[in-house]
Amino acid sequence: MHQGAPSWGRRWFVVWALLGLTLGVLVASAAPTSPGTPGVAAATQAANGGPATPAPPPLGAAPTGDPKPKKNKKPKNPTPPRPAGDNATVAAGHATLREHLRDIKAENTDANFYVCPPPTGATVVQFEQPRRCPTRPEGQNYTEGIAVVFKENIAPYKFKATMYYKDVTVSQVWFGHRYSQFMGIFEDRAPVPFEEVIDKINAKGVCRSTAKYVRNNLETTAFHRDDHETDMELKPANAATRTSRGWHTTDLKYNPSRVEAFHRYGTTVNCIVEEVDARSVYPYDEFVLATGDFVYMSPFYGYREGSHTEHTTYAADRFKQVDGFYARDLTTKARATAPTTRNLLTTPKFTVAWDWVPKRPSVCTMTKWQEVDEMLRSEYGGSFRFSSDAISTTFTTNLTEYPLSRVDLGDCIGKDARDAMDRIFARRYNATHIKVGQPQYYQANGGFLIAYQPLLSNTLAELYVREHLREQSRKPPNPTPPPPGASANASVERIKTTSSIEFARLQFTYNHIQRHVNDMLGRVAIAWCELQNHELTLWNEARKLNPNAIASVTVGRRVSARMLGDVMAVSTCVPVAADNVIVQNSMRISSRPGACYSRPLVSFRYEDQGPLVEGQLGENNELRLTRDAIEPCTVGHRRYFTFGGGYVYFEEYAYSHQLSRADITTVSTFIDLNITMLEDHEFVPLEVYTRHEIKDSGLLDYTEVQRRNQLHDLRFADIDTVIHADANAAMFAGLGAFFEGMGDLGRAVGKVVMGIVGGVVSAVSGVSSFMSNPFGALAVGLLVLAGLAAAFFAFRYVMRLQSNPMKALYPLTTKELKNPTNPDASGEGEEGGDFDEAKLAEAREMIRYMALVSAMERTEHKAKKKGTSALLSAKVTDMVMRKRRNTNYTQVPNKDGDADEDDL
């Protein structure tokens, strides 16, 4: 910021300059004046009453002594000749005046001067009276409080159910010699009767092996393993899921016994008990099980508390409700401690059971969405607007409350709202606020229900109570109560909530911007109006002091004015170019000692080539045609005058230097406009329904259905065990059935026979299996070859035995006979020459008796087999033969010859 007064260095410079000018004036007064010297004294003399002289050249002309003057060109404003008495020294001391003025004009080329003639009263004006300022637009009945926002409950009603059914599988198999082929598999599912569920499954943990069901209006019965009906124990499933358990009676499918080249049938009945999740959606007329099976009956149907009016599509004999039902855990066999009311329903495919509960308050069509600690309610026109910065939303509702009795199945709304409000109030407002009345309910656009609890600070509680009592006093003393059946007969409806909250976010944004802009514009309008009224009062007083300035500002252009009573007479001012105006350097009146001009003297032209007009510089660049602004000269005179776009500084009534407007400290007269910038606001993500809620809103969970269906075989069947067809199974089954029909003795004999037959079959099967092995076949082949070789050698031996028995039986003896080694024997033989006849006869007799002994043993053996008579006959024959055996034998001399040996 430039200071208006010159610095101390500049002041000392001005003092020395004035001293120099004073000495110059004294010297010049004694010296003759050169006739052509330019200066300002001529203008001063003319002002003192001397002859009028032309004005000095305009400020835009080139000064004397320009280093590069333009030749052969007539100046635009030629300098008039100066009188001979001009003070040349003073003019030389102030030679820089034009340059300073030229610099000021160059900095502010748009600064104009105006010549304002005195008004004659032909045109008069008056000021407008003060206006009534507008009021700031505001909402009405601003209320703070706690809010709980409810949305439509799209989540299904979930409960546990138990399925009872029997999987029936009938398989047709054709058996070949080396392979088996399924010709058809029939699978069906049959329900379990109520009596079996209660008396067998829940009471004992067993299930019958038969399945009775109706297909094509024909009752049929399936027997497990094609056998008689028995009780089978339920066992836990192989793989349990995270949300349910299961039990069943068998793992393996029953296949018929193997009979080659025949078609056989086998039946499997697997009793299954399975815990599943059930789901039902509004209006709860049906529910679906996790297996994908639909039940076309309301889960709240029953015979208690009027629940028989709920929806059902089944006949009465298919449904049964059991009071005081104690469920049993089929795994631990433990019985429940608390009884329940159990619903049982049989369908063509299964029987389902679940615990009955009343419809109210088990389900609710609305659910809590947001708890808002700070909710501002404002009234705009015919609606309420509930705004919250915490969730960046604005809800629009009617002015009337929404009765909860109109909400179908809305019992949870009041309870949940009160619990949430009490919790928020106790945590945050218990020490500073009080509750005003009961919670109020409003239905907002988009299907939201707002529970609102108005609050009031403790400091305003007393005032509010008085106001409330005043309002109550204005109401009728005995209001007409509603009819008794009004609430009961009111129609109920379900509130549908939109899935997007963007409209409320946009409404909040619009209200936020609207509130800010309206508040800002309201303050601007009020401040502007009040400022105008204030300025009007000031102008009415200021026009009396300076009517020209007030009239010029009011009209919007430069005019001259004077007061004619209570009105102003105005006249239009004529603009004069800044290049046609020059200020003189002295404000003293030479003809009147002690008198000085109060404002600088000027010379100007209306047009570029027009004559000079002498005048005086007025306020705000006004050129006065008169020079009557005179004042007594004072010591220490210092003045700043507006000249063009800047200021000229006169000290001791003489020009000193120029200043720009920036060198003068500015004091603002403007009133600050209180405009608050729009604050930043961040929007947080807000969802009405989460992805999990949307995914869970459907009646069917297809992922769960597919998972259960694909897991069914893994849970209730053994998929790893492989049963190979056995050709002997039919024989064993027949033998077993035969001996079973003979009682206990038959069963005992059957076990022995079955064991023996099983051993034989196992041995044969082992041999067959051994033969089917390549190594076994090789071993058998080698054994066969060995047997053939042994048979060949045995056949040779028999042939030798037939041809020469003694040589075959006694090969070494006959060999010694051919080659004797004993000399005595050799000599004796050589001497004897022939065999001993006695020994030869004795040998023959021995052979005959050996044959007789063999015949007798064979006869006795046969007699033992034939019986007693044959045995007696054999004994008699033996006695006869013994008598023949008593013949006396004598030793035969051993005289064998060589000829006999050759015969042998």
Swiss-Prot record:
Function summary: Envelope glycoprotein that forms spikes at the surface of virion envelope and binds to the host cell entry receptors MYH9/NMMHC-IIA and MYH10/NMMHC-IIB, promoting the virus entry into host cells. Essential for the initial attachment to heparan sulfate moieties of the host cell surface proteoglycans. Involved in fusion of viral and cellular membranes leading to virus entry into the host cell: following initial binding to its host cell entry receptors, membrane fusion is mediated by the fusion machinery composed at least of gB and the heterodimer gH/gL.
Segments carrying motif Golgi targeting: 849-852
Effect of residue 174 to R: 90% loss of fusion with host cell
Location of the region described as Disordered in the Swiss-Prot/TrEMBL record: 32-88, 470-492, 883-904
InterPro entries: Glycoprot_B_PH1, Glycoprot_B_PH2, Glycoprot_B_PH2_sf, Glycoprotein_B_ecto_C, Herpes_Glycoprot_B
Family the entry assigns: Belongs to the herpesviridae glycoprotein B family.
Major location category of this protein: virion
Name of the featured protein: Envelope glycoprotein B
SUPFAM superfamilies reported for this sequence: Viral glycoprotein ectodomain-like (SSF161008)
Stretches in topological domain Virion surface: 31-774
Quaternary structure and interacting proteins, as annotated: Homotrimer; disulfide-linked. Interacts with host receptor MYH9/NMMHC-IIA. Interacts with host receptor MYH10/NMMHC-IIB. Binds to heparan sulfate proteoglycans. Interacts with gH/gL heterodimer. Interacts with the host coreceptor PILRA.
UniProt effect for mutating residue 179 to S: Complete loss of fusion with host cell
Organism, as annotated: Human herpesvirus 1 (strain KOS) (HHV-1)
Gene name linked to the record: gB
Motif placement: Internalization motif: 889-892
Modification comment: The cytoplasmic tail is phosphorylated by the viral kinase US3. Phosphorylation may be linked to a down-regulation of gB expression on cell surface.
Localization of this protein: Virion membrane; Host cell membrane; Host endosome membrane; Host Golgi apparatus membrane
Topology in membrane: Single-pass type I membrane protein
Annotated region (Involved in fusion and/or binding to host membrane), positions in chain: 173-179, 258-265
Intravirion side: 796-904
Region (Hydrophobic membrane proximal region): 719-772
GO MF, any single term: identical protein binding
Signal peptide extent: 1-30
Residue positions the entry lists as glycosylated: 87, 141, 398, 430, 489, 674
Transmembrane domains' residue ranges: 775-795
Residue stretches of biased makeup (Pro residues): 476-485
